[in-house]
Amino acid sequence: MEEKKSKVILHGTWISTYSKRVEIALKLKGVLYEYLEEDLQNKSESLIQLNPVHKKIPVLVHDGKPVAESLVILEYIDETWTNSPRFFPEDPYERAQVRFWVSYINQQVFEVMGQVMSQEGEAQAKSVEEARKRFKVLDEGLKKHFPNKNIRRNDDVGLLEITIIATLGGYKAHREAIGVDIIGPVNTPTLYNWIERLQDLSVIKEVEVPHDTLVTFIQKYRQKCLQQAANA
């Protein structure tokens, strides 16, 4: 851990994949921090003041200075605490590829995951088909651009790995809650292998949501979405 006397506070929510990204990043760097759970149905005045533009989590407060948006926060953490692991490769092309696939997950993958979770019947079947296509693209991209990736310890984790495990690490809970199988050793072997190796790391175990808790949340969230759609 790098010696740095400072006050670090993270405003987040336990279920947010964006909050999890920041938690993982802080733990990887060995940064001591205070965690404040926010109720997004009743946002605190401090959250609104710290992030007046979006009024969203996560917000990192470092020595009284707020930083918002998960990707911006992760870059800030990496530039402020320069000890290992570094979240971006030194090679410019590899760094560009990391940014590209993080963007792909944030836009293409996250979107279709939400559709699969909140739909049923024919609409869901179409979204599942689209999800499998997008996940296949991600899987092939990881295989092509990061062929020598070996995840064995915390120092092997960077921005892309953080994004993958925070966003997709709960795929087994999604499968149990929704009954849809997308990630697996046959469908997405490279992605599956990355996730399995990441889940073996101690830093990931520290922040992961218990399986049964996540299943229950997804089921309740799905029912809420379906009820809202029925009443629309």
Swiss-Prot record:
GO terms for cellular component: cytoplasm; cytosol. Residues 91-226 form the GST C-terminal domain. Pfam families: GST_N. Glutathione binds at S16, T17, N42, K43, K56, I57, E69, S70. Keywords: Cytoplasm, Detoxification, Transferase. It is found in: Cytoplasm, Cytosol. Gene3D superfamilies: 1.20.1050.10, Glutaredoxin. Its EC number is 2.5.1.18. It comes from the Eukaryota. It catalyses: RX + glutathione = an S-substituted glutathione + a halide anion + H(+). One of its GO terms (biological process) is glutathione metabolic process. Residues 6-85 form the GST N-terminal domain. GO terms for molecular function: glutathione transferase activity. The keyword Membrane does not apply. PANTHER family: GLUTATHIONE S-TRANSFERASE U10, GLUTATHIONE S-TRANSFERASE, GST, SUPERFAMILY, GST DOMAIN CONTAINING. May be involved in the conjugation of reduced glutathione to a wide number of exogenous and endogenous hydrophobic electrophiles and have a detoxification role against certain herbicides. Belongs to the GST superfamily. Tau family. This is Glutathione S-transferase U10. It comes from Arabidopsis thaliana. The lineage of its organism: Eukaryota, Viridiplantae, Streptophyta, Embryophyta, Tracheophyta.
